[in-house]
Swiss-Prot record:
Protein name: Large ribosomal subunit protein bL32
Pfam families: Ribosomal_L32p
Family of the protein in this entry: Belongs to the bacterial ribosomal protein bL32 family.
GO molecular function annotations of the record: structural constituent of ribosome
Any single Gene Ontology cellular-component annotation: large ribosomal subunit
PANTHER family per the UniProt record, alphabetical: 50S RIBOSOMAL PROTEIN L32, LARGE RIBOSOMAL SUBUNIT PROTEIN BL32
Keyword annotations of the record: Ribonucleoprotein, Ribosomal protein
Top-level taxonomic group: Bacteria
GO BP terms in the entry: translation
Length: 58
């Protein structure tokens, strides 16, 4: 197994983890139903880009 040769300092450990932070999800309000949804996704009502594309699940 691989074993570190030297102890990694707290500073270097934290610098290594600097890109692991979670970012907030980008949600938008659907203009047809008024519910929150992810961009470029079909809403729960089955609408995409103002048109009904699937049957409603709610």
């Amino acid at each position: 197994m691989a074993v570190p040769k030297r102890k990694k300092s707290k500073s270097r450990r934290n610098m290594h983890r600097s890109h692991l932070a979670l970012s907030a999800a980008n949600v938008v309000i659907d203009p047809t139903t008024g519910e929150y949804k992810l961009p470029h996704h079909v809403c729960l009502g089955g609408y995409y880009n103002g048109k009904q594309v699937t049957e409603s699940k709610v």
